[in-house]
Amino acid sequence: MSQELTINADQLTEEQIAEFKEAFSLFDKDGDGTITTKELGTVMRSLGQNPTEAELQDMINEVDADGNGTIDFPEFLTMMARKMKDTDSEEEIREAFRVFDKDGNGFISAAELRHVMTNLGEKLTDEEVDEMIREADIDGDGQVNYEEFVTMMTSK
């Protein structure tokens, strides 16, 4: 597992690492190379992340191996790399939803689905379109909302 985490941190650009180091240093008050768990949320928010308290606690528990309440820079990098990866996929799904939701009302209708699929070169019958909607339509209202779309996209 630790090998996989290292790979994630290795995928950061030098610019990203420098940016994270700068933010890390701002909150490493005594300059000893560690930040306290309380400061973690502030650091992440300064980098455009918006973790919940539960997410922060989970990340701290995963990273703070010795349980002393502080995080060193390599641990911090690992955590940020993982967090960035999660954010990207979430943003990609949101972007895909916007593509399908032509009128921006928060729902994908059969007509919108047919339109996008046709633009992608997929000629579907009405039955095929209805079947796709039915598969994703958890609450049975005949259209697909964002939550249903996320479920569909992440269940594969």
Swiss-Prot record:
* Positions bound to Ca(2+) 1: 28, 30, 32, 34, 39
Mention one GO molecular function.
Answer: calcium ion binding
Q: Which organism is it from?
A: Strongylocentrotus intermedius (Sea urchin)
Q: Where does Ca(2+) 2 bind?
A: 64, 66, 68, 70, 75
Its recorded name reads: Calmodulin
Q: Alphabetically list the UniProt keywords.
A: Acetylation, Calcium, Metal-binding, Methylation, Repeat
Question: Record-annotated residues binding Ca(2+) 4?
Answer: 137, 139, 141, 143, 148
Q: Which domain of life is it from?
A: Eukaryota
Residue ranges occupied by any EF-hand domain in the UniProt entry: 15-50, 51-86, 88-123, 124-156
Q: Which family does it belong to?
A: Belongs to the calmodulin family.
Q: Which positions does the record annotate as the modified residue N6,N6,N6-trimethyllysine?
A: 123
What this protein is reported to do is described as:
Calmodulin mediates the control of a large number of enzymes, ion channels and other proteins by Ca(2+). Among the enzymes to be stimulated by the calmodulin-Ca(2+) complex are a number of protein kinases and phosphatases.
Task: Give the lineage.
Answer: Eukaryota, Metazoa, Echinodermata, Eleutherozoa, Echinozoa
Q: Which positions carry N-acetylserine? A: 2
